[in-house]
C-alpha cells in the first residue's frame, strides 16, 4: 500500500525512529527488520508515538468506523483426538466435562436466543462423530431456518481432520460445505506460524505451511477467512514477525483475509499454562504494541480486531487507538475463553457495544464476517 498519510501528532524521542516513521507516513512498506525493532521499543515516549502512528494509519486506511457483530457461538462437541498443551476446551471420551450436540439440538440453541444475531461461530473438537455429513446437515438446517445469518465455521485444524477422516481433499470438503451454507472460516489453528513453536503447543497438528494452504484454498473458492495470532506463550519477537510476514505474503496473493485478531494465551486450566508459571513468557511486548505493529506491517489488511472479552473492555478500547477498527462481538454462548478462565464478568449487548464505541468518538457499525 502506498497511501500517504498525515504526520502523527506524536513524534518518537529516539532520533533514529523519526526517519522510519516518516518512511511509513510516505507509504513505504514496513520491513521485517524494522517491525522487530518497533516491537522491542521500551521508552514510554517512543511507545506512545508508535501507538499514535498506528492510529493515524488506521484512520487513513479505514476511517473512524468501528465494526461489531451480534454473534452466537455454537460448539457441537469438545471431545477431541488431539492433546494440545494450550487448550482448556477439549475433553477425552468418558470425561464428564465433555458434551456432544446433534445438529437439531444446535438449531434449538439458536431458537432460544432472545437477542437478534448476525452470525453464528461454530468450532468443535476433532472427533469422528462430527464428520462431513454432520456439518453438511448442520449448515443446511441453519441456512434453511435462518437464511440471513452468516455461518463462520470450523478452523483449518478441523478441515484437515475431515480430510484425513474421509480421505477427501480439503478443496472438495470446502466446496460441499459452501454449498450447504458455509460463509466464512475463523482463524483458529494459526497460533504462531513457526513450526518449532507449534510443535511445543500442539504436537501432531498441521504445519504452518498446511494452515496457510487451507486458507489459500478457501480464498480460491471465494470463502473469506479470518487470521489470528496467539501470543504470550513460547513465541519470541522474531517469531511474531515471521507470523505477520507469512500472513502478509498470502494476503498479497489472495486478498482473502477479512480480519486479523491478536489473542492472548490463557495460562489457566491447561498443561502449557502450568509449565509457563515456572518458565515465564519469553518477551514482555505490550499488547498495544502488538496491535500497532500489526497495523503498520499488515498494510494489506483492512480490519484488525480487539477482542474485548479476551482483553477486558478497557484494554480493548485502548486498542482502538492503536490500530484496531473492530471491537469483536457480543460473544453469546462463548465457552473457549470461559473454560480457560479468561471470561470477563461484564456482558455486552449490541446497544452496549455501540455506546462504548461512540464514547470513543468513533462510529459504530453492526455487521458480520461477510463484510469484515
Feature map (PLM): residue ranges:
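Auxiliary Fe-S-binding modules of radical SAM enzymes
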Residues: 1-43, 108, 245-372
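Conserved, mostly hydrophobic/aromatic
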Residues: 27, 54, 84, 122, ...
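Conserved short loop/turn motifs at secondary-structure junctions
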Residues: 38-41, 71-74, 124-128, 231-234, ...
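N-terminal pre-triad scaffold of radical SAM enzymes
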Residues: 49-93, 98-123
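Helix C-cap/helix->beta junction micro-motif
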Residues: 61, 145-149, 221, 254, ...
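Mobile, glycine- and charge-enriched loop segments
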Residues: 66, 87, 139-143, 147-162, ...
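Hydrophobic faces of well-ordered beta-strands that scaffold small-molecule active sites
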Residues: 66-72, 118-120, 151-155, 185-187, ...
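Conserved Radical SAM active-site core
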Residues: 93-228, 233-242, 246-249
